[in-house]
Curated annotation (Swiss-Prot):
Pfam families: VPR (PF00522). It comes from Simian immunodeficiency virus (isolate Mm251) (SIV-mac). Its main location: virion. It is found in: Virion; Host nucleus. Gene3D superfamilies: 1.20.5.4730. InterPro entries: Lentiviral_Vpx_assoc_factor, RetroV_VpR/X. Plays a role in nuclear translocation of the viral pre-integration complex (PIC), thus is required for the virus to infect non-dividing cells. Targets specific host proteins for degradation by the 26S proteasome. Acts by associating with the cellular CUL4A-DDB1 E3 ligase complex through direct interaction with host VPRPB/DCAF-1. This change in the E3 ligase substrate specificity results in the degradation of host SAMHD1. In turn, SAMHD1 depletion allows viral replication in host myeloid cells by preventing SAMHD1-mediated hydrolysis of intracellular dNTPs necessary for reverse transcription. Keywords: Host nucleus, Host-virus interaction, Inhibition of host innate immune response by virus, Viral immunoevasion, Virion. Interacts with the P6 region of unprocessed GAG. Interacts with host VPRBP/DCAF1, leading to change substrate specificity of the CUL4A-DDB1 E3 ligase complex. This is Protein Vpx.
Length: 112
């Protein structure tokens, strides 16, 4: 009889380093910011970052990586809800309250 337990998928041996995890986190935050500016108001993106930093880092004393993780979770949820409501941003553009004209926003503090 074969072993019923799951096998570790190739490439996921558990040998990844913590440094690779931090690199992934930084890359993913930058990628979600680049995508978010196509769908959400710049002001909202900045406010989510600022509030995440103020609460998780300044008030709760959490690490910069933890702040990025929580920010990433919030932005993923915001983009999911935006798309679930029927995103038409790339085809028809934003309606009132959506994307503001102008240059792309600067990266959130701590990510430059």
């Amino acid at each position: 009889m074969s072993d019923p337990r799951e096998r570790i998928p190739p490439g996921n041996s558990g040998e990844e380093t913590i440094g690779e995890a931090f690199e992934w986190l930084n890359r993913t935050v930058e990628e979600i910011n680049r995508e978010a500016v196509n769908h959400l108001p710049r002001e909202l993106i900045f406010q989510v970052w600022q509030r995440s930093w103020e609460y998780w880092h300044d008030e709760q004393g959490m690490s910069q990586s933890y702040v990025k993780y929580r920010y990433l979770c919030l932005m993923q949820k915001a983009l999911f809800m935006h798309c679930k409501k029927g995103c038409r941003c790339l085809g028809e553009g934003h309606g009132a309250g959506g994307w503001r004209p102008g240059p792309p926003p600067p990266p959130p503090p701590g990510l430059a």
